[in-house]
């Protein structure tokens, strides 16, 4: 489980680096649209909890969070196959698992 959350946070570092490179005019390996969405999210970051400590559902639908959860879950699924015990936000439904499967297929094709 710790590996899962490390992967999630490492993905945030990657996102941030892509935003930094894009802003500096450097070539990036991520589509411009994704980077601009990440930049928007970082500039108006929504916290996971509301003032009353209740869960803020909007947090989970930021592009940076969806991407980080998909990446970390897909990496774990690719490596370990059975990942039923990993945390998936209840806000996510089939669209999340469809995105994960697409990433796992990319990993398969690349022979990682």
Q: Model-derived features: where do they sit?
A:
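Catalytic Zn2+-binding segment of zinc metalloproteases
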Residues: 9-27
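Short pre-active-site segment immediately N-terminal to the catalytic Zn-binding motif
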Residues: 1-6
């Amino acid at each position: 489980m710790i590996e899962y959350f490390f992967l999630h946070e490492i993905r945030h570092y990657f996102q941030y680096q892509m935003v930094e490179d894009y802003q500096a005019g450097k070539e990036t390996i991520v589509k411009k649209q994704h980077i601009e969405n990440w930049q928007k999210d970082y500039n108006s970051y929504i916290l996971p909890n509301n003032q009353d400590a209740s869960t803020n559902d909007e947090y989970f639908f930021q592009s940076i969070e969806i991407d980080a959860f998909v990446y970390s879950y897909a990496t774990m699924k690719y490596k370990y196959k059975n990942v039923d015990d990993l945390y998936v936000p209840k806000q996510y439904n089939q669209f999340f698992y469809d995105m994960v499967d697409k990433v796992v297929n990319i990993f398969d094709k690349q022979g990682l």
